[in-house]
A protein has these predicted regions:
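Solvent-exposed, membrane-proximal periplasmic/extracellular interface segments of envelope transport
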Residues: 245-329, 386-405
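Extracytoplasmic/periplasmic
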Residues: 220-291, 343-376
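Extracytoplasmic/periplasmic membrane-proximal domains and adjacent transmembrane bundles
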Residues: 1, 69, 347, 354-534, ...
């Protein structure tokens, strides 16, 4: 779909045969990239991320080919269909298009080096786009000109489908010319005339849009949960759970799931069942999983089934952990580590945290690593017991055999070994009082009550004690419904309204937000370093062809305004800003400077030819309008199919595609309006500096 949209866009505005050869370079680029994915080179596989890399590259890699193809065709049409003119047309735009590709390579290569598990995952599509871009340089600078060298520019009028398409192209070209002369040029002249006001207006727009995430108009979730294709219940029991409790809990969970399905079907006015498969798996005696898949025609959603199933289930006996989820979480959700030297402080803080979380909508499956202690009975031989000949070893063996049992016989039944164990009847070994009332045998065979030979102490012992940096520690965790509240919003809320009071009340308590918050801090730190490196690389690559340190900064103003476009795209599509969005924004940083580089390079060439300042700016913008619009539109339409995709796999890709697609559209307006204004402001400042320098020289001279 994306390839078709790109080709149609090219064919609308380029000569049909030029558009064909530009699009024909895509197979070379993609097959070449597949070759470098083999074991001998990058050792990568075709998966969701690498496929997304190809889709993202689809609109980007034709950008320089569009510029080269248009330049070659225009040069040959003006000066003749010769090989020399083909070379001249290629050479005219070779440097800006080459360095434009290299700036994009710099950002995608930086993206492939983001650290962390998720960074490693997303680095795959960064590597794919980098390979595609490098191969596009070979295709656009060597292969494409070779094809265009044999393309006649002077042809007779066509009939049939070709003639009809020529009329369509004529309409498209007329529309572009109307836009250029009736809308763009008048607006451009107003912008350069009132350039300082225009820059202030753009800055105001930047401030307003960047405030959207801060005000909550655009929600932020660094690691958003994605819709899954099943509902899963994961059950874990305490180690001292009674025999058969796991099986009983799984049976109850299964019944609740079926009841939730019946209720939802009735509420929707449907018939039958929405469940296509239900699989129950018991892992030993202390854990199990139930996985439910829904029929394609079910009248309710996975989230609705998950919520109703949770509501019907409530608290189960002996359960340590129960999570019923319909969404795939990229990392652990909410988690906070509590540490203190005082055990009572930890227990109180643990209770307070759980109570606060229970009152927050969208927070569920709250768990704590503070497990109930195990009841313990300790026996101490009395002086009378020692006098009667009882010792610790004899007492422990008798109690173990009485309550745990002793194997007295083994035999085979159907090739299976059967153990015969002798112990007290079940009704006599279920309660602590049964131990208190037991009888023990002395060495001479006399049977006496346990209380005669031993004192019994009852206590509670923790199953495990966790220490971090010498302090007792525990963890409170929870799952978060990001449609209601994200983990980022939850942490911010707790830091503002709860944590300060808790730390004031328990001064020996320290806490640390782990889980998603910890992963976010780690990934953000890596992305900041990578982003700075990418910006420095872009600056260096722009400074080389422009031979200036100021003009690269002017061009790079398109980057923050590209981010504005990305945020507007998220806002208009109801998307949350996330790590996936930031990956798209990082990639956007290299793409948005390409059109500005073309424009500034053309401006510099016109100035060297002696054209007046404002005339050079206007001529550079109008002459590059077609190429700028075409490269931006092809990038957007190449990504557009992802933006409309509803499949579960695409949910990981849409935020990055929205960042790049909408960012490049908005950056186009920046290229065509803000960059000319900034060029003239720079010339204004340079002129003031030159005049001031002359005045100083006259005074000192």
């Amino acid at each position: 779909m994306g390839i078709a949209l790109v080709f149609v866009t090219l064919a609308l505005f380029l000569n049909l045969r030029v558009a064909f050869w530009v699009a024909a370079g895509l197979p070379f680029i993609f097959f070449g990239t597949l070759y470098f994915m083999t074991d001998s080179y990058t050792n990568m596989t075709l998966n969701e991320m690498t496929t997304f890399g190809f889709i993202m590259a689809l609109g980007i890699v034709v950008d320089d080919a569009v510029v080269v193809g248009e330049s070659v065709y225009a040069t040959r049409k003006q000066y003749g269909d010769t090989l020399q003119n083909t070379i001249a047309g290629t050479h005219k735009v070779a440097i800006p298009t080459l360095f434009g590709v290299l700036t994009t390579v710099a950002t995608f290569f930086a993206l492939s080096n983001v650290s962390g598990g998720l960074g490693t995952l997303y680095s795959q599509f960064g590597t794919i786009v980098t390979l595609c871009l490098l191969l596009s340089v070979v295709e656009s600078k060597l292969i494409l000109p070779a094809h265009l060298a044999h393309l006649p520019t002077k042809t007779t009028p066509k009939k049939g489908i070709a003639g009809l398409w020529n009329k369509v192209q004529g309409k498209a070209d007329a529309g572009l010319q109307w836009f250029n002369y009736r809308l763009y040029q008048p607006l451009l002249k107003v912008t350069v005339t009132y350039r300082y006001a225009a820059v202030l207006l753009f800055i105001a727009l930047f401030v307003v849009v960047m405030s959207l995430p801060l005000t909550g108009a655009v929600r932020v979730s660094f690691f958003p949960s994605m819709q899954g294709d099943t509902v899963t219940a994961n059950l874990s029991l305490y180690s001292d759970a009674s025999f058969g409790q796991n099986e009983r809990n799984l049976l109850l969970l299964e019944q609740n799931a079926l009841e939730a399905d019946r209720q939802l079907i009735a509420e929707k006015g449907a018939e039958g069942s929405g469940i296509s498969s239900l699989q129950v798996t018991a892992s030993g005696d202390q854990s199990g999983t139930i996985t439910i898949s829904l029929d394609e025609s079910q009248p309710y959603s996975l989230d609705e089934l998950s919520a109703r199933w949770n509501a019907l289930t409530g608290t189960l006996e002996g359960v340590k952990s129960l999570k019923i989820r319909s969404r795939r979480e990229m990392v652990d959700g909410f988690k906070v580590e509590l540490k203190s030297i005082n055990e009572d402080t930890l227990i109180a803080a643990n209770t307070a945290f759980q109570e606060v979380l229970e009152d927050i909508d969208g927070v569920y499956a709250i768990e704590s690593s503070l497990t109930p202690g195990e009841a313990m009975m300790r026996f101490e031989i009395t002086p009378q017991g020692r006098a009667l000949g009882m010792d610790t070893q004899s007492l422990s063996q008798q109690l173990l055999k009485a309550f745990g049992g002793e194997i007295v016989q083994r035999y085979l039944r159907d090739k299976n070994e059967v153990k015969v164990r002798v112990r007290y009847p079940e009704e006599d070994r279920m309660n602590p009082s049964d131990v208190m009332n037991t009888q023990v045998r002395l060495d001479d065979g006399t049977v006496v009550p346990l209380s005669v030979v031993a004192t019994v102490f009852q206590d509670v012992q923790q199953k495990q004690v966790v220490r971090i940096d010498g302090l007792r520690a525990l963890t409170v965790s929870a799952s978060v419904d990001s449609d209601i509240i994200t983990s980022t919003e939850l942490v911010n809320y707790l830091n503002e309204s709860f944590v300060p009071q808790l730390e004031k009340q328990y001064q020996d308590l320290s806490l640390y937000f782990a889980g998603e918050a910890e992963q976010q801090a780690e990934t953000q730190s890596s992305m900041q370093s990578v982003f700075i490196l990418a910006l420095l690389s872009i600056f260096a690559l722009l400074a080389i062809p422009l031979k200036s340190y100021i003009q690269p900064l002017i061009i790079m103003t398109a980057i923050p305004f590209g981010i504005v476009g990305a945020i507007i795209g998220h806002w208009s599509n109801g998307l949350m800003l996330s790590l996936l969005s930031l990956n798209g924004i990082l990639a956007l940083s290299g793409v948005v400077v390409n059109d500005s580089l073309l424009l500034v390079s053309r401006f510099n060439a016109l100035r060297r030819e002696g054209m007046a300042l404002e005339n050079a700016v206007i001529e550079a913008c109008t002459s590059r309008l077609r190429a700028v619009l075409l490269t931006s539109i092809t990038t957007f339409v190449g990504l557009y199919p992802i933006l409309g995709e509803t499949s579960i796999q695409a949910q990981f890709l849409i935020p990055a595609a929205a960042s790049l697609g909408y960012g490049i559209l908005f950056a186009t307006a920046i290229t065509l309006l803000l960059i000319p204004a900034l060029l003239l402001i720079y010339e204004d400042v340079a002129g003031i500096g030159a005049r001031a320098k002359k005045s100083v020289l006259r005074v000192t001279g």
